[in-house]
Amino acid sequence: MPLAQQIAEWRQQKTLILGILGGQGTGKTTLAAILTEILAEMELQVCRLSIDDLYKTYADRLQLQQFDPRYRWRGPPGTHDVSLGLSVLKQLRQVSPQHPVAVPRFDKSLHQGAGDRIVPERLTAADVVLFEGWFLGVRPIDPALFDHAPSPIISESDRTFARDTNDRLQDYLPLWDELDRLIVLNPVDYRLTLQWRKEAEQMMKATGKPGMSDTEIEEFVQYFWRSLHPELFIPPLLSQPEWVDWIIELDENRLPTSIYCPYNPGLD
């Protein structure tokens, strides 16, 4: 896999922190799992970390929700412990048997699906850190863009929420600065993530597990679009080669149609 070989080259004898940005259902977790197996065959030890692992505790998110009811679901900027993430990434650069790192882990099934932290994972080595998330590396944009934002940012309260989450992105920039490289999974149409989420729920329910209805899924996904709309936030990121190293274009079946470097489109 050329991507795994590229990651090995990027490492250069020090711990590499590689970000993977992808919306819901784009396959970022699957990609991280595949890369972990391939890199292991190359004798590289991998630590997988999700932005979800940095969620604030259940108790802290309850307080946030009471203070600001708009944060009814975990996920948007403001629901994570950024200082924890910074500390963990910095420690992972120095990890060794003499300096083990407690990597945070999050269980989404706790508290009737609200989720909470569980016992951290103790690591003593990491050649590569695969850090993935639905808005990893995303930067604040000009607030004026929300004056004529795409659906479902429709009402004035929608625009206010979008501006507020845009402001909160500023708190995440120190975390993004820890990334050595960033890969973006970019679907041909961001609205495909809604379809993919529905498919995932249907598969989960087919195994006997509880899942959301189509209406609930639409409300859930649109909540994320209101907080950080892909049409507003992704194009500016992709246009800046100093922020993105590889872009993987995905078709409607989540299959890659193109893999390229924005600063060297001929490299694939």
Regions found by a protein language model. Name each.
Residues 1-19, 23:
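Extreme N-terminal, non-catalytic leader segments
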Residues 13-14, 123-125, 177-178:
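Short loop/turn elements that form and flank the Walker-type P-loop nucleotide-binding site
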Residues 28:
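Conserved lysine of the Walker
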Residues 31, 35:
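Hydrophobic positions on the alpha1 helix immediately C-terminal to the Walker A/P-loop
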Residues 37-47:
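Post-Walker A helix-loop "phosphate-sensing" segment adjacent to the P-loop in P-loop NTPases
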Residues 47-50, 54-110:
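Conserved nucleotide-sensing/catalytic segment adjacent to the nucleotide-binding pocket
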Residues 90-138:
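Phosphate-binding/switch loop-helix module in NTP-utilizing enzymes
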Residues 135-268:
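Conserved NTP phosphate-binding and transfer environment spanning the P-loop NTPase/kinase superfamily
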